[in-house]
From Swiss-Prot:
Keywords from the UniProt entry: ATP-binding, Cytoplasm, Ligase, Nucleotide-binding, Pantothenate biosynthesis
Annotated GO biological process: pantothenate biosynthetic process
Predominant place of localization: cytoplasm
Entry similarity comment: Belongs to the pantothenate synthetase family.
SUPFAM superfamilies named in the record: Nucleotidylyl transferase (SSF52374)
Assembly: Homodimer.
Species the sequence originates in: Chlorobium phaeovibrioides (strain DSM 265 / 1930) (Prosthecochloris vibrioformis (strain DSM 265))
Protein's pathway: Cofactor biosynthesis; (R)-pantothenate biosynthesis; (R)-pantothenate from (R)-pantoate and beta-alanine: step 1/1
A Pfam short name: Pantoate_ligase
Protein name: Pantothenate synthetase
Enzyme Commission number, as recorded: 6.3.2.1
Chain residues that bind ATP: 30-37, 147-150, 184-187
Length: 292
């Protein structure tokens, strides 16, 4: 595995790989690697001959009162994990290399980025869209793998790639989970043992919502409210939001229609730690009580 810190050097390497007809896959991370990240690397490895992993704690996607300065940065451990996972190139630039003096460009993506995480974390998705676009331009991959845990981020990236005609295939990878259903996340290290156990209620509650949809419920707004109540009751955590969106448009949805797919998303505070998760439901072609 070769570690690269200079964007120009990384671009040069990728250009040579492309000239050699090597299929390039990229996995973008902020470090603090865990088994979820490794699963993304494995998926990239299945589809590409060369895998690039990026580690960059992006300052522009953190709000003023968020955890940028204390976000874990165990670089040596991350590098060892990346090497053992079969990563070919580790791209780990400093902030000044990505945002040099005079940098003044930002990408905004209206619509999908305006609700939920976008509403709760102003400027977050602009930071995400900008750094992802830069990293795509630097690594020049044929495909980029992102986890479904950050479902809204995935939707934003897909929108940006489509709107800006970026020639890359966006691949979604399923969420890795701990034994109690808690979505694997770098921020889970902040949780106490008790919080970690209680956090299993998030996934149980989302699954319960999908079960109710499968049983014929169609009122998504009411079901989201009931799910928020269940999460709070079973975990003792403060719920930031629970909401349904249409899977195709990622716009808010209040009633399930036949033949449509919906995603329920939740954000929860376990003490001062913010956890997010989601689950997808594919509606049958007929829903009880709905006219054909």
């Amino acid at each position: 595995m070769q570690t690269v810190t200079d964007p120009v050097e990384m671009q040069t390497i990728s250009e040579k790989l492309r000239l050699g007809r090597q299929l390039i896959g990229v996995v973008m991370t902020m470090g603090a690697l865990h088994e979820g990240h490794i699963s993304l690397v494995k998926l990239a490895r299945e589809q590409a001959g060369t895998v690039i992993l990026t580690i960059f704690v992006n300052p522009t996607q953190f709000g003023p009162n968020e955890d940028f300065h204390r976000y874990p940065r165990p670089f040596e451990q991350d590098a060892a994990l990346a090497r053992s996972a079969g990563v070919d190139y580790l791209f780990a630039p400093e902030a000044g290399a990505i945002y040099p003096e005079g940098f003044s460009t930002a990408i905004s993506c209206s619509g999908v980025s305006d609700l939920l995480e976008g509403e709760k974390r102003p400027g977050h998705f602009s930071g995400v869209a900008t750094v992802v676009t830069k990293l795509l331009n630097i690594t020049r991959p044929h495909l980029a793998v992102f986890g479904e845990k950050d479902a809204q981020q995935l939707a934003v990236i897909r929108r940006v790639v489509t709107d800006l005609n970026i020639p890359v295939k966006v691949v979604a990878a399923p969420t890795m989970r701990e034994s109690n259903g808690l979505a694997v996340s770098s921020r889970n290290i902040y949780l106490t043992a008790g919080q970690r156990e209680s956090a299993g209620a998030i996934w149980r509650s989302l699954q319960h919502a999908l079960d109710r949809l499968a049983a014929g419920e169609t009122g998504l707004k009411e079901l989201a409210e009931a799910t928020a109540t269940m999460i709070a009751s079973e975990s003792g955590f403060r719920v930031d939001y629970v909401a349904f969106v249409d899977e195709e448009t990622f716009m808010p949805a209040e009633r399930a229609l036949k033949g449509r797919s919906y995603r329920i998303l939740a954000a929860v505070f376990a003490g001062g730690i913010r956890l997010i998760d989601n689950a997808c439901f594919a509606s049958p072609t007929h829903i009880a009580g709905e006219e054909a």
